[in-house]
Each structure stands twice: as C-alpha cells, then as structure tokens.
Design a protein with these regions (language model features):
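PLP-dependent aminotransferase-like
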Residues: 89-145, 161
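Buried hydrophobic positions in well-ordered alpha/beta secondary-structure cores of metabolic enzymes
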Residues: 23, 63, 81, 95, ...
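N-terminal "arm"/small-domain region of PLP-dependent enzymes with the aminotransferase-like
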Residues: 2-53, 60-62
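Conserved N-terminal alpha-helix of the aminotransferase class I/II PLP-enzyme fold
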Residues: 34-80, 87-88, 104-111
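Glycine- and other small-residue-rich loops at beta-strand/loop junctions that grip anionic moieties
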Residues: 74, 98-99, 148, 152, ...
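Hydrophobic beta-strand scaffold residues
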Residues: 120, 170-171
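Active-site core of PLP-dependent enzymes with the aminotransferase class I/II
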Residues: 146-169
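Ligand-binding pocket scaffold of soluble enzyme catalytic domains
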Residues: 42, 141, 156
C-alpha cells in the first residue's frame, strides 16, 4: 500500500537528495551552463541548459509528485507550453475555448485555424461552454482561468468532468 502525503510534505522533501558534486542536500540552482561529457556522443543527460538542466529536472519531478503523475514537463514560456500541449492533438481537432484569452494564444489559435490544423469555437461564459459541451462535438476544451484581461474564473473541475464525459481532452492555462 502506498502512503499518501499531504502537499506540504511533498514540497518539503522535493529535490532533497545528495548532490554528488557538492554534497548539498537540497538541489542547487543551475542558471546557465554547458555540460562536460565523458566522450563524444555520450551525454551525461544534460547538454545545454536550454534543453535540460538539473534545476528544471528537480522542478519537473516535484510537479509530477504534486500531481501524482509519472512525469511533468516544464517549458520556457506559457506559449511554448500551449504549443507543446496542442502538438498531441490530431489535425482537424475541434477546440472549444474561452473567448477572453491572452492575445498571443488568440493569435496562435487563429493561425492554426487558418492553416487548417484545428477548428475553434469560442464561448464568453461558463454557461456557453457547458452548452457547447452538451450539444457540439468537442475534442479539446481550452480554458484560461483567470482569463486575460477580464479575470473571469471558471469551475475547472466541473468543466473537466463534462468534457471528459464526452471524451474531450482538457487544457488549462493559468
């Protein structure tokens, strides 16, 4: 039987391991560097800090532990996270999204629609989202909460339950 820990316990112990190079018990912060390898073509697992570094690896392990997930991915920006999330959806996916979005997301969505990758339906309120989930085919529900710029909030758990019941995936940006 696996013991379940409270969030505070997970966070207090995340990243606590002995650093081989320094003996530090808490993971040091690695800002920017390149890494030495034993020989050409044999990586230590870290090449350049912009692809992977020990600090981000610790953060990803911590996020996975908090969510009881096998793994988590950290990206360099919110837009890169959105692009990464949408990369798993097939061409032609029908996306239901909140209308009040960060401008960069809205522009990227428009570009994707113009290129024929996805089709988007937008809703202004939670009631409209529920209506579309009940009546329209939806492959992906995309919500931003609180929204930008109007700071609207949505019941993520309720919307996710409805979307999952219809077989839709849910992407949440906050």
């Amino acid at each position: 039987m696996t013991q379940e820990y409270q969030l505070e316990t997970i966070l207090a112990h995340a990243g606590i391991n002995s650093d081989e190079a320094t003996g530090a018990l808490a993971s040091p912060i690695h800002f920017s560097t390149t890494y030495q390898h034993p020989e050409f073509g044999h990586s230590t697992g870290f090449d350049y800090t912009w692809t992977k570094n020990p600090t981000r690896a610790t953060a990803e392990k911590t996020l996975a532990a908090i969510e009881s997930a096998d793994y988590a991915l950290a990206t360099s920006s919110g837009m890169s996270a959105i692009v990464l999330a949408f990369s798993i959806f097939p061409v032609g996916s029908k996306v239901l999204a909140v209308r009040d979005l960060y401008g960069g997301s809205f522009r990227w969505f428009n570009q994707q629609e113009q290129e024929g990758r996805f089709s988007f339906t937008y809703a202004n309120t939670e009631e409209e989202l529920i209506h579309h989930l009940d009546h329209d085919p939806v492959d992906v529900l995309y919500i931003e909460t609180p929204t930008n710029p109007l700071m609207l909030e949505f019941d993520i758990a309720h919307l996710a339950k409805l979307a999952h019941a219809k077989g839709a995936k849910v992407v949440v940006d906050n």
